[in-house]
Amino acid sequence: PVLIQPNAGLPELIDGKPVFPLKPENFAESVERMADMGVKMVGGCCGTNPDFIKALRTRLGNRKYRKRDNPKRTAAASARQTVFFDRGFRVIGQRINPSGRKDLADSIRNGDLDPLYEEAVLQKQAGAEILDINVHTENSEERDIMAKAVEYIQSMIPIPLQLDSSDYSVLEAGARVYNGKPIINSVNGTRISMEHVFPVVRKYGGCVIGLSLDENGISPKAEGRLEVARKIVGTARTYGIPKEDILIDCLVQSAARGAKAARETLKAVSLIKRELGVKTVLGISNISYGRRERSVLNAVYLAMAMGAGLDCAIVDPTAKEIAEVVGVYNMLSSTE
């Protein structure tokens, strides 16, 4: 349900004091229009008093709640912006991650979050629509840092965030302070993971990335990953989490394992979308791990994944080749 507590209009500074322009009747009339949009609970904030609440009661007291018939869509949201996953390919920026980056890891351990903000700005300017936030470092309080990082970045960056940790308590710490609907990264098909992560997703609301692996590891076959994905979607439903709030990661493995493994992941993308009707995501840069020409390999594999029906990818949006692939794909697939 949506709750609103608006001010009595925008204040004007008169004789050094804020004066709110709306009278109780005007205020109630404005709030009534919001109720017509589907708001369930109403109240008043700055500039209101009991007369305003009485006017609300008089106008809305006998009104029945107008339930909205909302379409089921996959979306992530900040307090200021919503990203829908049925409107073109979506880019999730991966650069706020200290893995393999000593300078960033040192900053996080020292409580300096400015480099995270700088990375957030850089990625947004490069075209990222969602930012992955991973703050795991050795010998640090990851839960506290995640909460502080989420609050800090959200205070200045308008796009949604993806909370990334293998520790469910860290995910909860981030979700608790998040304004909007985040993406939780991630849950997998093991019983213990689902028992820990799904309650967090249900309690705070959000999308969740489901890794297509379980107690048996990563299946070498697309069909095996489909069954794990099916288990994740089915179990999520028992927690009240709809499939529209699930993105399945079909798990990219290094090309060093062979071209067959790379193709099997793409097959899994198509299969899972067709059979389960859920959105799919990949961490593209895993394909080039341990290889020389990483940028070209990442870009080519991203293009192949898009052709297989991939909905979004976790990538470095500042990489020129990645930006070009995404731009050309969205241009050619546009219905405008």
Named regions from a protein language model:
Residues 1-247, 253-336:
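Domain-level signal for soluble alpha/beta catalytic cores
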